Amino acid sequence: MSVLLIAEHNNKEVKPFTQNAITAASQIDQDLHVLVIGKNVDEVSKSISEVPNVKKVIQVDNEIYENFLAENYTPVIIKQSENYSHIVCSANTFGKNLMPRVAALLDTSQVSDIIKVISADTFLRPIYAGNAFATVKSNDKKKCITIRPTSFDPAPSTGGSAEIIKVDGSEATTLTKFIKREEVKSDRPELGTARIVISGGRGMQSGENFKLITSIADKLNAAIGASRAAVDAGYITNDHQVGQTGKVVVPDLYIAVGISGAIQHLAGMKESKVIVAINKDGEAPIFSVADYGLEADLFEALPQFLEELNKLNTIQK
């Protein structure tokens, strides 16, 4: 029994969530191999080979994989899957796009978004927006699994010395064609991996008022998030959305401002290490998960908070 993990990267560096997925995959079985598909990915393969618990790195390098099309990735994974009992990857946009295609072609039932490995065939996963948990046992000979990366600690980046093997890929698909990629460039930490996140909700009342959050985020070197209500109201773009239909975050510090705390939002942030809530409604559900709560008008509290941060005259790194 061996595990094949699909690495996520940008052709230059390994994406952080791959390290978390390695931790989870190694709990399934210690015979862990990692598949790296991309263009000019020698450095990516080398980096992964140095991760403890990784026994082998399989590299498929071709320009047709430069833009990470799931339609091009899938035939490669199917081709390499023959000798593996488990095919795994992260349960983010990358994995959610890729793994259902793999599972369908392998005619196996996918086990999605696991948060705990109970045994090689049994896993724990959240249901009902995280308000309940299901223990799932898979009887399939070959198991396709996506892992919620925030539920596992990242694997160390050094200490290993895995073998790197280069193999051929498959022909490019003609069903889809890459057109272009639009990326939002920001000096802020990435929302999904930031140590500190400050999010605003419908209580911000307008996009202009999000400048209050921006000023504090600058001081804390924090990522900016938002509830779905704030996004739907047009206060901020949807790439900032935290929750069941947005990003799942587990920062060291999560500050919720003007967010009532609908279960869909809580599903995306309630595993944060420390949660601070600021809301003038003392009955808001957000206070039920908060470690620290401030019942106050955010338009009075945030300027005072910023004033205190300015007195410190420091920016967190």
What feature does the model see in each segment?
Residues 1-317:
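N-terminal glycine-rich FAD/FM-binding segment characteristic of electron-transfer flavoproteins
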